[in-house]
Swiss-Prot record:
PTM field: Phosphorylated on tyrosine residues by BTK and SYK; upon ligand-induced activation of a variety of growth factor receptors and immune system receptors. Phosphorylation leads to increased phospholipase activity. Phosphorylated on tyrosine residues by CSF1R.
Compartments it resides in: Membrane raft
Taxonomic source organism: Mus musculus
GO biological process, one term: positive regulation of dendritic cell cytokine production
Residue ranges occupied by any SH2 domain in the UniProt entry: 532-635, 646-735
E.C. number: 3.1.4.11
Domain PH per the UniProt entry, residue ranges: 1-131
GN (gene name): Plcg2
Subunit structure, interactors included: Part of a complex composed of EEIG1, TNFRSF11A/RANK, PLCG2, GAB2, TEC and BTK; complex formation increases in the presence of TNFSF11/RANKL. Interacts (via SH2 domain) with CSF1R (tyrosine phosphorylated). Interacts constitutively with THEMIS2.
Major place of residence: membrane
Any one GO CC term of the record: membrane raft
Name of this protein: 1-phosphatidylinositol 4,5-bisphosphate phosphodiesterase gamma-2
Positions of the catalytic residues: H327, H372
Organismal lineage: Eukaryota, Metazoa, Chordata, Craniata, Vertebrata
Amino acid sequence: MTTMVNVDTLPEYEKSQIKRALELGTVMTVFNARKSTPERRTVQMIMETRQVAWSKTADKIEGFLDIMEIKEIRPGKNSKDFERAKAVRHKAECCFTILYGTQFVLSTLSLATDSKEDAVKWLSGLKILHQEAMSASTPTMIESWLRKQIYSVDQTRRNSISLRELKTILPLVNFKVSGIKFLKDKLVEIGAQKDELSFEQFHLFYKKLMFDQQKSILDEFKKDSSVFILGNTDRPDASAVYLQDFQRFLLHEQQELWAQDLNKVRERMTKFIDDTMRETAEPFLFVDEFLTYLFSRENSIWDEKYDAVDMQDMNNPLSHYWISSSHNTYLTGDQLRSESSTEAYIRCLRAGCRCIELDCWDGPDGKPIIYHGWTRTTKIKFDDVVQAIRDHAFVTSSFPVILSIEEHCSVEQQRHMAKVFKEVLGDMLLTKPTEASADQLPSPSQLREKIIIKHKKLGPKGDVDVNVEDKKDEHKPQGELYMWDSIDQKWTRHYCAIADAKLSFGDDIEQAVEEEPVQDTPPTELHFGEKWFHKKVESRTSAEKLLQEYCAETGAKDGTFLVRESETFPNDYTLSFWRSGRVQHCRIRSTMENGVMKYYLTDNLTFNSIYALIQHYREAHLRCAEFELRLTDPVPNPNPHESKPWYYDSLSRGEAEDMLMRIPRDGAFLIRKREGTNSYAITFRARGKVKHCRINRDGRHFVLGTSAYFESLVELVSYYEKHALYRKMRLRYPVTPELLERYNMERDINSLYDVSRMYVDPSEINPSMPQRTVKALYDYKAKRSDELTFCRGALIHNVSKEPGGWWKGDYGTRIQQYFPSNYVEDISAGDAEEMEKQIIEDNPLGSLCKGILDLNTYNVVKAPQGKNQKAFVFILEPKKQGDPPVEFATDRVEELFEWFQSIREITWKMDTKENNMKYWERNQSIAIELSDLVVYCKPTSKTKDHLENPDFREIRSFVETKADSIVRQKPVDLLRYNQKGLTRVYPKGQRVDSSNYDPFRLWLCGSQMVALNFQTPDKYMQMNHALFSLNGRTGYVLQPESMRSEKYDPMPLESQRKILMTLTVKVLGARHLPKLGRSIACPFVEVEICGAEYDSNKFKTTVVNDNGLSPVWAPTQEKVTFEIYDPNLAFLRFVVYEEDMFSDPNFLAHATYPIKGIKSGFRSVPLKNGYSEDIELASLLVFCEMRPVLESEEELYSSCRQLRRRQEELNNQLFLYDTHQNLRGANRDALVKEFNVNENQLQLYQEKCNRRLREKRVSNSRFYS
């Protein structure tokens, strides 16, 4: 196998030679997971974009990967790609695999060079380039990103971009162009003389665009309190920030102690500028460069000192640490049918996870397998997993790894497990205590590079103390069944499970259903689906008008064309195209040769189809006496939808609703022309409700919402058949007369009316929402007489959602007054979510459940002859007359028997609990060889709930529900236990979608191993990633010393809590936000303090419309001050959402940090995706200030808290008086008087708090004398 070269010791000239060789490229064999045959390709490094590309020919790149996304470069034949292709003839020393991506499941590029020397060169070069990319300055990253944009429109890697291409690119990077005039004006401003920009001009255009959009942020540095005063900010180079000013900024605003050294400040500026012409003793930043610095990762909010390992903190017993832990580590997705993979173990270990789970079952040939038992998840070999653990356990962290074994194997296969552990892991395996006489667990330092086995252990007399993790309902029938779909008249496969006399089923498994083979399209009809084919156009003039309008909008490119049926010659066609500023036409003639229709423009070159003719002239020139021309851009047919079955030209809204109400299936849809307007509406069914959405016309485009542009309605439908239109709903069932006849049923009136929202329209959302209640997230003081003043926690009733971000509501004595919508959260929405959680709480399919059948209301019968081409069928016949039967089928007769028997026992109301228990009873035998490997993590269950007298050699495992019960009832007992013993908590069985529970309360009580699903990109996994970003990402974080104090209470009474600090945050702007789907993002930011219940609080900004590239919230956005009780155990979380066309929030990016790890000042917040992977150049700019609360100020904050609580009580009492006539009386006047007095007093207290914050800030902002 090829060994990695230590590139750190290579001289610079050798590094340059290696990089040059990679840039020139190497012919290699590429192994593709989707292809059984490897292919020869040229693989090369594109230095300008920092991408590895592979291509068959020089002018056509087949694929590429960003070098910053590389997670591992693995030498040898160590990927499945080599196995699939049976790469026998390629030597292992010439092979390597690049693993890359930003999701949990990584992509692979497996390569084989022709020589060992080439392989070494590539392994070394990739490592060098990856190191350089990860340490590149932000201006360098911006230049690379700009190159990618140019190359994305032209793979020839030219050094320029046209105005038309620029207009195409900007929406793709999340910026809405108001019109071609906007771009032309910008080009004039940067001095471009024509509609073609060089790369340097493109770079200037980008800088000018970003600066103009965000220069208002710099007003923050024109205030008297600023540590330096900026000059003119009208233009990017209108003024500058000089060395001494920058030092003042770093020292006083950013509180960077290293900035006391002027040389370090000079070095920071010089490296950031990266301009040899400005490498002087007195460097400066132009104002646009200063603004870019504020957004850059060089100015990150994260304190980089926590990237280093604190070795002094690694000498405590293991029980004093939080330990990064994974649940069902082998899974790459959900718990029912996802893939099990050794790569999942590698991904978790290299992410710093230190406790992983092995779910072991008897396998073939006497060797165990790992998978999620009793489900359809795939199986992997135990031996392969142990080898992967050996190779990757200590790559990221050298501290111990705990293997949590869930044992289902026979004794014989357990012996094999013990043998493999010892042979493969060798000296890594911990087989005896570090200290024989110790009375506590060893420290992480004592256990470096050791692997610990957590497994059941035989006692001194051979007895077993077991801990069987909760696997509720795992032995009841569950698996895939076919269900008969009466709409599509076909069998669809669903995952089903029985629990509590109910059969639950998930959504249909579309990829598993056999599809009818696609019929080959006859050559003569190939052009029908092409957008350049316009069928019969009214006249020659109409065709010319279409071309003229298209060319006026797109830049009049020669060769722009369309094809139409000939007006005068049957079977012939007309090619209309744009050349030299006018439209020209050519007749496409047809002739019959040997019974086959041929088409031609010139007599000497005929084609079998119109499609073949057009494809030829798009690649080769059309030559005639006057000109040579190649067909370029097709003019799309504006009306291809008219022939589609889902389109209705004259259908009213009421008629559309009536049709949709008869199809009780999410994804049913139609599109109709709206009466009296040049717009359309899509009517669809989602979540059981009928909804509408308007589609407007903008020139030749169809626009859904404000920025989702489509060339045609056909393209719109095709897109949303593959992507979610509303929440998770895709278009699936075109509503046609045939479908209505097939599914002939009564109208479902309930589907039309929805208590939460009846009509979904991006432009016309019903503003009247009576009786809605919202909760204030923060204090707000009215700025006008028609606005509400309220305190955090206040309930505002009878809310009416007005447009523009201002809503109306009732609070106290003030009726229907305005307040900002981003200061509140909708309680009713939260209640609906909580209700949904309650419904799925005990469902065996959890949130994946799409339907439930109560088996007590059915009789089950077999279909002896089968049905609908399935041999093994059973039918649930309803006991209630009139209800339709439900038909199921299996693949095997054994499955049919098992399901039929289980359902029959329920429907006959037989008590089979005792029989089932006997049938599924487990043999708890343990192999001595495996038992002997258990040293410290011996599970116990006999006295698991008794937390007294912990044994440090034992570990107690709790399902999340049991752990939550203990936390609520005896949090202090659990904390005391965890100071000496270990606990592991894992998700409940109902989380089949692999969702995660909130780990915080368990961390608060000292639980070390709070196991989460690493493959799930949710909030709690992101918090987990944030916690373990401390201490150099070792996977071990020392719990605060205060938690080991005898006086520490993880859940103190309110009277015992003290505010220790305040955190003030202001969101100023963002850059390079990611883009979802076709629409340009309309972003807003949610800022949240995550911690104990008494610390949790959040705030939302307003929505910025149609700008995800450079949105700004300053200067209108106000500062928000959070009160923090325990800064050591709280997180600051930023989440960026986009508001979609239905006013629903969609996750875009996040950044989550432990509060102890953030820095003050004007800070960049680098954004991450759901999996906490960096997003290129994406960042927020925020102002952040932390201030400890002095003991003398605690009384003031305590008074504020008490008044807020009292105001909430008074407001609720007043609401009751005003909504219940029988309660009206004299008491109301007293309540009103007290409410008003308290409100004034609260405002005074709040002003006093704010004044102290301002005074503190001014004292920190003095100039150097």
